[in-house]
Amino acid sequence: FFGMLYAEKWRGIVAKRFQRVVVGDDGKPEVVGEVGDKDQKIVDDEWNELTIIAVGNRQIHQVNGVTTMDLTDNHPEAKRKGILALQLHAGKPMTVEFKDIRLRHLKGEDAKAAIDSVTEKAGNTATPIDRIKVAKGFKAELLYSVPGDTQGSWVNLCTDNKGRLLVSDQFGGLYRITPPAAGETLGAADIQSVPADIRAVNGMVWAFDALYVAVNDYERKMTSGLYRITDSDGDDQLDKVECLRQMEAKGDHGVHAVVPSPDGKSLFLITGNNTTPTELAETSQVPQVWGEDHLLPSMPDGRGHNRARLAPGGIIYKVDPDGKNFEAYANGFRNIFDAAFNRDGELFTYDADMEYDFNVPWYRPTRICQVTSGAEFGWRNGAGKRPTFYADNLPPVLDIGPGSPTGVTFGYGAKFPAKYQNALYALDWSWGKLYAIHLKLDPNSSSYTATKEEFVTGAP
């Protein structure tokens, strides 16, 4: 029913989700086609954007940019004007939150353009090469455009012990790909499904003769947490799945990347601030004395975002290969997705801002952080975020600005000029940017200074 149309009083449900409906002069609705994307995933406890386009007798609903209902209403008593009203339907106790409500009056060509711009189903296609800007001397090539209707949305990749790519669908399973030769592309026949019964993998790495994956399942069809996947019978197919640690996570601030340690003895698990802290070993590096620590009354987010989520925020765990011992290596992050070690064994991550805090004193931009053992980075609920000058809160190496951080990696081994081989690459999902972060040891401290460069920029 998400995105359907329910008419006033006795008319009731006129058009359900995915339906194109025409109501005749006799008031009877007829389903004349389908609209929308039946693979679209909508999470009811996260913010969703509802768009209603009403022009004459035509009304279209969209959720998160995808059309959910298209109605042509010729009913003799159909309303053509009125008021905007927000209501709860009768039934069991429930909560509905609204924000950023905007009303735009459409007239003439604007009204026609609003209707004409709506498509039934855009589908996933790769950004055209001519819409991608790269640093001078570099060139981008399209290897494969993922068909969203059959292979979902790919959110993570790694290489296995034979140099093949393993990729994950955000709401589906895994695929295996043999990388093509230089100048060649991939076709549908090159994409192999992995038989392992696993889904919603947000992070993965090949280590200790196995594939370790972090599951973060919005739809709760599979328990989130850390899993190990192996080949049970030597047929070169990953088919055995072991859950090493179940974790409680919510939304896209959950269980994320898995990173191997430089000494090859452990793993680092990256989690966002909506992951409930798990049981820790006594050797955990972060002192378990954190708290919200507000001298003045707390001021949670005025829009209601994460009002009940308190310290310690996002945690980086150090984990043994069997997943039995979890140590909190560092915490106090908002929503880190990935991390990477440099040649000296120093760990770096890219933390998120809180976009609703923009222009308030406690706003903290997305930032590159050097993560040291036992460190606290000061994320707290609402207005309680710790400024960088607090003595018990480590500052970032570099502030980036507004964005949505995802993957990070160093360029070691790439056939790039030395400057770019040594760079840390940080991907910003919301602005479609890949930054090259150029780090330099600071002679006046034990940390680094850094500058950023827009290495790749894409436009949808």
What does each of the following model-derived ranges do?
Residues 1-120, 227:
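Carbohydrate-interacting regions of secretory-pathway proteins
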Residues 116-460:
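Beta-propeller domains with acidic blade repeats across secreted/periplasmic ectodomains
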